[in-house]
Swiss-Prot record:
The modification 4-aspartylphosphate is found at residue 78. InterPro entries: ARR-like, CheY-like_superfamily, Homeodomain-like_sf, Myb_dom, Myb_dom_plants, Response_reg_B-typ_pln, SANT/Myb, Sig_transdc_resp-reg_receiver. It is found in: Nucleus. The gene is RR22. It comes from the Eukaryota. This is Two-component response regulator ORR22.
Amino acid sequence: MLLGALRMEERKGLMGRERDQFPVGMRVLAVDDDPVCLKVLETLLRRCQYHVTSTNQAITALKLLRENRDMFDLVISDVHMPDMDGFKLLELVGLEMDLPVIMLSVNGETKTVMKGITHGACDYLLKPVRIEELRNIWQHVVRRKFGNRERNNLDFSKECNKPQSADTDHGPYQPTCGSSDQNGRSSRKRKELHGEDDDEGDDNDYQENDEPSAAKKPRVVWSVELHRKFVAAVNQLGIDKAVPKRILELMNVEKLTRENVASHLQKYRLYLKRLGAVASQQASIVAAFGGRDPSFLHIGAFEGLQSYQPFAPSAALPSFNPHGLLTRTSAAAAFGLQELAAPSSTIQTSTGNVTVGHCLEENQQANLAQGLTAAIGQPQLQQNWIHQEGNGLSDVFSGSSLTNTLSSTLQRVPSSSLPPQELLECKQAKVSMPPSIRIPPSSSALLERTLGVSTNLGDSSISQQGALPIDGGFSADRLPLHSSFDGAVATKLDTSLAASQREIGQQGKFSVSMLVSPSDNLALAKNAKTGASSSGSTIILPLDTARHSDYLQFGGASNSLQKMDGQKQDHIQSSNIIWSSMPSTQLPSDTQIHNTQSQRLDSGSFNHNIGAHLADQTNASASILPQMKFDTRISEEKMKQKNTYDLGSSKLQGGFNSSGCNFDGLLNSIIKVEKDDLPFMDNELGCDLFPLGACI
């Protein structure tokens, strides 16, 4: 133990003495091709008490350094040499030995000095060299050793903190540490590797900068065909299970990456989300109309009416009030009727409740309202379709009773239950509705004229109100509706198929009586198939309606006028109405409403009968074939004409509401009145109130 301690003390003493004598004995290698300069340099170094080794060739100096790596502490080399450039020697020494190198040259330009420093020279001396400069070159050796020691200590600390692996030969607490030279060499190797990597990285960056277009990814344009392939792949996988990788495999398109498919899939899902929001909005609209199945929103064009536009899924309902439709709130079957004063020029009317409930479902009404508006293309509906200058005719026809009669009959029918032969015969049929107009015999100047209305089913267009083409309008499954209404009060059935009958009593009250009775007469159906069915009726107008002859261009009808024998004579007329597109489950097989009461005027009674056949079928292109006969008696008291009349909302006594739903405006979108252009039809009908062009 004592001997070991003594040896350690001796070594420390020697090291201390060497440190005290430093830089005496520092080993220096001098390289210069000029022998004179080399001899002067060697002499000056020896005066500084350095150990000097000199050579005039750079290759020889490099060989000495490689053979004896630990024999030299410093290298002094000339810049310009014949066998090897001084900068090249500087690079090799710095990479292999990690020794400090001092450059020596007569060229003191800044560019040359900068080149030497950048290549790793620790100092740059100019010839002729001076001894004062050589005395302080030892600081480069000390600086390099301390720098290497600091790096070694840093590497040692990292290795000590690193956990030992299981396959190492050293113990778990024995870090592997080599000598300072080995650490220096390893650090130099790491520097060399990092330097090479940096050079390669710089070269790559330079190449990338030279070719910027190669770095950018080509943009994919999603054409129609490419999008179809994408949608087909998504549908095959399912929207929930569709992932970009599987979609790309199914599409099998070159130059299409997963990122492109992922981006397009995200946009496609957002598109489907927006479509779902629109569909939910439409479903809420259908629910507001009371419909259960919104499939009618996607049905094609209306069969039989080529100009009819269906309800578009993306269209909104800007002007149609869903609360305006008649909804059934009670089981009462009676009609609410209101009495109207004859002297007043404005006729207050109410709306019947049964016909809309049986004839047209609420969702179909909403579909019809929007579809007809879109078909005509009118941005705004005119509220008074017959309200023109000198609007006296509006008082005669009781406001909008005729217009609402048509508006309630338009239906949307999904499919037909008749055989193709029956449908073909019905399409070729021509149906006419020529009600006749007559002045009561109590007046001196009477006008007897016949009003004719016709529809040509072959043209698949509406040529007159109240007449529509029929496809499969006749069915063996008819539901008779038998109803009778008294004339105690006046009413206007906005959505009914019946024609009103008006009387003015002795007290000046304007009343309407109506009777609906079953009719089993099939002559109408047969005539409709052959195209020769028509019926006539009588409407009594006051004298002042003669000035509206330009509106009512009357002619001879196929049926003769039925004249009244007197005020005491009872006149009963019947009418056949074909009423289709009505499920049998919504109507009882036999509904009877009896409230008959004969009203007498000057010891005379008046009754009005209307027969209606309800055809239970699931599909027909058109829905209504009204064939009506009217017989109305009006006393000599004339109804005063007024330019405006009230078509506001009314509440029915039977518990039915019509809050703001104006079917006059709906009819306005179909028919546009033209005063001066009233075409006639030969022999089949009396006249057409409106030209065919206004209805298309």
